[in-house]
């Protein structure tokens, strides 16, 4: 299974916010299989999309060397379902960033209309217990970041481009 819950980033400002797009398709197995005969994109996958965008926003602050994991869904509110053919626009903002974890708040719009509010808490597994833990194979992680267009749209707060993952 491929772990893409967003299709691409449209904006990415280091340490501030990111916006991303997901085009819901009947070709997505989860859309058709989750509720046979009544296809829709599950809310849990929308949370996963927000977590993917937020986790990368956080991990980029450490040049993608951290082990950022979703720790808790602080709150989520969904107003209607996402259906095949809909475009979901994610916006995630970094609210609080500490060495051990971070908080993000986000919104999702479906075809321009507010579809969800989601607030997430992430943990950063950065102590010696996790030194040998690798969450992603480095080449596959680099491939994922490039496919999501992060380096095409990503900028630092001063407007300079975010550099590629040469160190991985």
Whereabouts are the PLM-identified features?
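N-terminal structural module
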Residues: 1-31
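Small-residue-enriched segments and motifs
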Residues: 4-7, 71, 90-92, 118
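A structural microfeature
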Residues: 20, 116-118
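Hydrophobic beta-strand-centered segment that forms part of the acyl-chain substrate-binding groove
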Residues: 54-89, 123
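Surface-exposed, gly/pro-biased binding rims or lids
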Residues: 121-164
